[in-house]
Amino acid sequence: GAATLSNIYQGLGYDWIRHLTMWAATAVLLCYLGKIILYPSVAKGEYKNTVPASLYAGITMVTMILCSYYKDWAPGLARIILIAAVCIHAVHILVFLFNNVFGGVKLDTFVPSWFVTFNGIMVSTVVGAAMLPPFMAKAVLVWGLCIYTITIPFMVWRLATREVKPAFCHTQAIVLAPCSLCLASYLNLAQEPSMALVGSLFSCVLASLAFIIIKLPVFFAVPFAPGFAGLTFPMAIGIVASNKAAAFFTGAGQETLGYAVKQIAGVQIYLTTAIIGMVLFGFLKMLFGAGNKAG
């Protein structure tokens, strides 16, 4: 989430924020990879559980974002790693479907974190569409649009009719991510975007954003935990989607609508910066608190 937000701040002229955030994201990614290599039994145990398994897709998503950063210095290597990340993510989707869908879906663990696995692969078409082979980029877009369309009605029904366990509470915020990824990817790749489809996807973005804002008091009513990270990426990618939608509407002659959407994006930047700042501060407190106890 912070890495995506740093890209937005770079667009506003704040390059240093992007550099610092991407370096930090690189360190975090290396730590996660180190954990998998050094403690494979722990990673394997987590992967057997539905919700943690769905979140493992975050590793390839961060990799894709970092490829868009490092391509300025090593374009060939960044492209290879990006394509590899897409392929690994695709394999992860297949394994996840086999483990958690084909044998029957358990409603207690059917939560919005599934979209991290299902639609997270679309990070590649948001940040690096030009680096992907055209057929791969198109396949990712078609998959993302189809799986979101299929899954979201069931997810809305599930959230409306069944209580989400406290441990999975913050995963509810992830509903903003898939529609935002679909919208941003579609506008990146479509030569002549459909006004109806863009309008429909942006309506989903607005509805999801409203859902999160309504839920914020619930999300922050509990003590800080790693699950708060579920708030970060959806909020950040929502800004990207809104900015792209604003540019599309303006370019299509809908200046008033484009202006309104641009102002909504401004509110999103304001709110997302506050949320991500609070979450990062919470993680720093956990880190230094653990260090003090160890000392």
Task: Show the residue positions of the predicted features.
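N-terminal signal-anchor module of multipass membrane proteins
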Residues: G1-L33, G289
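Aromatic-anchored, glycine/proline-accented short structural segments
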Residues: W143-F202
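Structural signature of hydrophobic alpha-helical transmembrane segments
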Residues: W16-L30, P75-A90, P134-T149, M195-A207, ...
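Juxtamembrane helix-loop boundaries in multi-pass membrane proteins
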Residues: G1-T4, P40-I65, L82, N100-V126, ...
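Alpha-helical transmembrane segments in multipass membrane proteins, preferentially the mid-helix core
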Residues: H92-F96, V126-A129, I150-L159, L181-N188, ...
